[in-house]
A protein has these predicted regions:
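Structural and coupling elements of P-loop NTPases
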Residues: 1-696
C-alpha cells in the first residue's frame, strides 16, 4: 500500500445500534472505491469486516475491523465496530483511535438505544461526527423522522445535507440542501441533474431552514444576519461547515442505501471535505524521564511514538498489535521502546490491516493506523516510543465486566490448555476476565453479558479445540454467631508411651467486627495453662475459622477467650492444645446461635425516567433495598440499592429486557448480612457433606 502523509488521512469510526447497517456500509464504500468487484453480504458471511468464524456464524460484528478506503488520494481508515452491547470493549478501543465518527442510523428503525450510546461515546471522546441514515431503499424508511428525532435530542447542531427523492416507492435520487439542486441515479449508477420535485419543495424548505439555523449558531455575526433575514452565500456556508463540522459544533445528516450503493459517493466526498485529519486534533502524553507533558499532536516532525489500541491474537493469522502513530514517522526495522514493559523491540515489517489481511507498507506517518507483528510482550494500551524520548499515553478506559459464570473443562485433562487459550482471548478482549476463586473451588469467567461469554466459549472450541461448560457461579457465604457460650473441651489420647493431653475452657461470643475472622484473648490465672501453649490455642482457633461447622464456609466476627484449662507435664503438647481449641470452637459455635451471612452488593443502575418504577419493583423481588435516586443527564435516573450478590445472577440480561437495552449497571461488594432462613437452610443442606463436626 502507498504511504499517506498526515493531512491525507482520516480515521473514522462507524458507530450505531446492532443491525443498523455499519458493515454493509463498509462494503458499499469499498465497492465504490474500487477495492472490491462485488459487495459482500453479512448474511452470506463474505464481508471484509466480519472475517471471524463467530461473526460469519452469527451474522453480526463481534470485533472491530480496520478497512482503509482510498478516496480522492486520501486514506480513510474506517473502523467498523460491533453494535451489540456485549462487545462494547471493541467499540471503546476503536473510538480511542478515531478522529471522527459516523453514527449510522437505520431509516426504518429510527433512533435506537445504540444510537444514543454512540452519541455519548462521541461526546466522551470529543469526536466530530456525521449521521448517515441507511435503508433508504426500504419504503418504510423515514429520513425526515430521523432528522426530527435527532433535532429533539441534540438541538440545532443537526444539519440535514440531503433529502431523498422517492417515486413509486423507489429511492431514485436526492436533493442537495445546500445547493438546493436535485440529482437522479441512472441505471448505470451515475447521477444526472434534475429539477427538485414539487412534492419535495416543502421538505427542502424545512431542511434548508435547519441547515441555516445550524450555521447561524456558529457565530454571533451569523446569528445577527440570520435573524435579520439575510441569506448566507454558498461559500460562507461551506466555510462555516468546514470549520464547525471538524470542531463538532455542526453535525451533518446524510442518507443513502447500502444495498444499492446510493448516497455513498457523497458520503465519501464529505468525509474528506469536512471531517478532520489527525493534524487538526490534539494528542498529549507524558515524558517518563522528565514527567513533562509531551504534545505529540500527530506531528510527523517530532520524535516517533505510537499507542497500541487493539490486539489481534488469532492462531490462524498470528498476533498483531494495532497502533496509531501519535508523532513522527515509523519505518521498517525501527527499534521501539515499550515504557510500560521496560523493553525495546525491533519492529520488523510494518503493516496496514484490511479486515484480517495484513498488507506491507514502508512507513506510517503520524496519525495513521497500522499494525506491528509479533511484539513479544506488548499488550493493548501500551505506549511505544524511543528510549531517549520515552512517552506514556493515557490508557483507554474500558468497561468493567459484571456478568459472571463459573466454567470447567468439558474433558478432563484440558485445564491447562483452557487456561492458556483464555490468556490469548483476554489478550484480544480486555472485557473478558478469568478469575480463580479458591474459596469456592471454582474458576470464574467475567464478561459484558451472556452472549459475550457464549462467544468466548465458542471461540475456545473453534480456535483451540477445547470446550468449557458455563454454569451459575457459587456465592461465598460466611458464618458467624449471635450469642456468648462457655465451652470446655479435653483432648486426651493414650496409646502406650507418650500420650496427648490438652484441656481448655473458653468463651466464644460475637466480636462485632464482621471484617475480621476472629479476635483471640486469654485471661488464664495461676498457670492452669502454661503461656507457651497460648499460641497453640490461638492456632487452633485460626484453623477452625477457615471452615465453619454450619456449612464449611469461613467464619467471621468471633471473639475467642481462653480463661482456664489444665495440662499434663509429660503428655501435653502444642498439637494437643491446638486440637482441643479447634474442637472447643466447633462444639461452642453450634450452641452460639450460628447463622449464615450472605454477601451484599452496592448496586448502581442508570435508566431512563420511565423505567424507574419497573426497576425498583424488580429490585424488591431480588430482596434489594433501594437507598436513593439521583437525576442524571438526558432524563435518566441513577438508582442506588443494596442487593444480595446471589440475586444479581442474570441481572444484565433482565435489565436489558426491561429497558430495551438502555439501562446500565455497576456494583461492588459492600458487606455481609444475615441471610434469610430459607436461603440458609438450602445452603446448609447443599453443603452438608463438606462439614467437619466436633468430636465428642
Amino acid at each position: 500500500m502507498n504511504v499517506y502523509t498526515t493531512d491525507r488521512i482520516r480515521n473514522v469510526v462507524l458507530l450505531g445500534h446492532g443491525g443498523c447497517g455499519k458493515t454493509s456500509l463498509v462494503e458499499a464504500m469499498a465497492y465504490l472505491a474500487g477495492m472490491t468487484s462485488r459487495m459482500g453480504k453479512v448474511e452470506d458471511g463474505n464481508t471484509i469486516s466480519d472475517y471471524d468464524k463467530e461473526e460469519m456464524k452469527r451474522h453480526f460484528s463481534i470485533n472491530t475491523s480496520v478497512v482503509p478506503i482510498i478516496w480522492e488520494d486520501t486514506k480513510i481508515n474506517i473502523l467498523d465496530t460491533p453494535g451489540y452491547f456485549d462487545f462494547v470493549g471493541e467499540t471503546e478501543e476503536a473510538v480511542s483511535a478515531a478522529d471522527a465518527a459516523i453514527v449510522v442510523v437505520s431509516g426504518k428503525a429510527g433512533i435506537e438505544v445504540g444510537t444514543r450510546k454512540a452519541w455519548e461515546l462521541c461526546e466522551q471522546y470529543k469526536l466530530p461526527r456525521m449521521v448517515f441514515v441507511t435503508d433508504m431503499d426500504i419504503d418504510e424508511a423515514s429520513y425526515r423522522q430521523v432528522v426530527q428525532d435527532l433535532q429533539e435530542l441534540y438541538g440545532k447542531k443537526i444539519a440535514p445535507f440531503h433529502l431523498p427523492i422517492r417515486e413509486n416507492g423507489q429511492f431514485v435520487g436526492y436533493v442537495n440542501v445546500l445547493q438546493q439542486r436535485a440529482k437522479r441515479w441512472k441505471e448505470n449508477g451515475e447521477v444526472e441533474k434534475t429539477d427538485v420535485p414539487d412534492y419535495s419543495k416543502e421538505n427542502l424548505g424545512i431542511c434548508r431552514e435547519a441547515l441555516m439555523e445550524a450555521v447561524a449558531e456558529t457565530s454571533e455575526e451569523f446569528m445577527d444576519r440570520y435573524f435579520g433575514g439575510e441569506e448566507f452565500s454558498e461559500d460562507e456556508i461551506r466555510q462555516a461547515l468546514r470549520v464547525n463540522v471538524a470542531e463538532g459544533s455542526i453535525v451533518p445528516v446524510l442518507m443513502g442505501s447500502n444495498i444499492l450503493a446510493r448516497g455513498i459517493y457523497t458520503l465519501l466526498v464529505d468525509i474528506v471535505k469536512y471531517l478532520p485529519s489527525p493534524e487538526k486534533r490534539t494528542c498529549t502524553g507524558i515524558n517518563a524521564k522528565t514527567n513533562e507533558v509531551y504534545n505529540a499532536d500527530y506531528d510527523f516532525a517530532k520524535a516517533k511514538s505510537a499507542y497500541i489500541w487493539k490486539t489481534i491474537a488469532d492462531p490462524f493469522i498470528g498476533k498483531y498489535s494495532l497502533i496509531k502513530v501519535n508523532s513522527g514517522v515509523l519505518k521498517t526495522d525501527d527499534i521501539l521502546f515499550n515504557q510500560h514493559k521496560d523493553v525495546e523491540e525491533k519492529v520488523g515489517k510494518l503493516y496496514v490491516m484490511r479486515g484480517n489481511k495484513p498488507e506491507e507498507v514502508k512507513e506510517l506517518h503520524a496519525g495513521d493506523i497500522g499494525a506491528l507483528a509479533k511484539l513479544s510482550g506488548a499488550t493493548t494500551t501500551d505506549s511505544l516510543s524511543t528510549k531517549t524520548n520515552p512517552i506514556l499515553y493515557i490508557r483507554t478506559t474500558i468497561s468493567t465486566p459484571y456478568t459472571c459464570k463459573r466454567y470447567k473443562a468439558k474433558n478432563k485433562g484440558d485445564e491447562d490448555k483452557i487456561s492458556q487459550a483464555l490468556q490469548k482471548l483476554m489478550l484480544e478482549d480486555l472485557t473478558l476476565k478469568a478469575v480463580n476463586d479458591s474459596e469456592n473451588g471454582q474458576t470464574l469467567l467475567y464478561g459484558m453479558g451472556d452472549q459475550h461469554l457464549e462467544v468466548a466459549a465458542s471461540k475456545l472450541f473453534e480456535r483451540y479445540k477445547v470446550e468449557i461448560e458455563l454454569k451459575r457461579p457459587k456465592v461465598a457465604f460466611r458464618e458467624t454467631i449471635r450469642k456468648k457460650v462457655d465451652v470446655e473441651y479435653k483432648y486426651k489420647k493414650q496409646s502406650g508411651g507418650h500420650g496427648q493431653y490438652g484441656h481448655v475452657k473458653m468463651t466464644f461470643e460475637p466480636s462485632g467486627d464482621l471484617e475480621q475472622p476472629y479476635v483471640f484473648e486469654q485471661c488464664v490465672v495461676g498457670g492452669a495453662v502454661p503461656k507457651n501453649y497460648f499460641p497453640a490455642v490461638e492456632k487452633g482457633v485460626q484453623e477452625a475459622v477457615l471452615k465453619g461447622p454450619m456449612a464449611a464456609y469461613p467464619v467471621v466476627g468471633v471473639k475467642a477467650v481462653l480463661y482456664d484449662g489444665s495440662f499434663h507435664p509429660v503428655d501435653s503438647s502444642e498439637m494437643a492444645f491446638k486440637v482441643a481449641a479447634m474442637q472447643a470452637f466447633k462444639k461452642g459455635f453450634m450452641d452460639a446461635s450460628p447463622i449464615l451471612l450472605e454477601p451484599i452488593a452496592s448496586l448502581k443502575v442508570v435508566v431512563p425516567d420511565k423505567y424507574t418504577g419497573d426497576i425498583m419493583g424488580d429490585l424488591n423481588k431480588r430482596r434489594g433495598r433501594v437507598l436513593g435516586m439521583n437525576p442524571t443527564e438526558h432524563g435518566y435516573q441513577e438508582i442506588i440499592a443494596d442487593v444480595p450478590v446471589m440475586e444479581l445472577y442474570g441481572y444484565n440480561t433482565d435489565l436489558r429486557s426491561m429497558t430495551g437495552g438502555s439501562g446500565t449497571f455497576s456494583y461492588e461488594f459492600a458487606r455481609y448480612e444475615q441471610a434469610p432462613s430459607d436461603v440458609q437452610e438450602k445452603e446448609i443442606e447443599a453443603r452438608a457433606s463438606k462439614v467437619d463436626r466436633a468430636e465428642e
